[in-house]
Amino acid sequence: MAYSFVIDVPRRVVFSRIWGTLTDEQAVSHAKTLKDDPRFDSGFNQIIDLRELANLQMTSPGTKNLAHIVPFRPDAKRAFLVGTGEAEKLSKVLWTYTEAGVDQYTLFRDLPSAMEFVGLDAKTPWPDRAPDQTFGS
C-alpha cells in the first residue's frame, strides 16, 4: 500500500489518499502519523480518497483497533471517496465501529460532493502541492 496526506491548515481539512493494498499495520501507521504531526488538529475535517484501493487485507480486529485510534474528533466531518467494493466495504465497517452518524461520516463517489460535505466549494480541486507525507510506493 501507499498513502499520502496533505494537511491544509487554513481550510482545516486533511486530504488523504490510499492506493494499492491496505493492511492493518499500514492503516494504523496512517492514523498515528497524522496524530503525531504538530500541524494536525483533531477537529479538522478529512477527505480520504480510496478510489485506487485495490486490495483490502485488513482483519476485523485490525479494523476495530483502527476505529478506536482514529485521530479525528467524533464531530469532524470525514468524506470517504470510494470507487471499488473494497473501499466501500472498509468505509462501512469503520463507520459501524466508530459509531459515527451520517452527519460526520459519509461515502461519496465524486470529489465535488465530498468537497461540499467538508465545507469547501464543490469546484475546489484536490491540492496540487506535494504531499506532506508519502509512504509506500
Tell me the role of every PLM-derived stretch.
Residues 1-137:
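Amphipathic, Lys/Arg-enriched alpha-helical "gate/interface" segment within cytosolic domains
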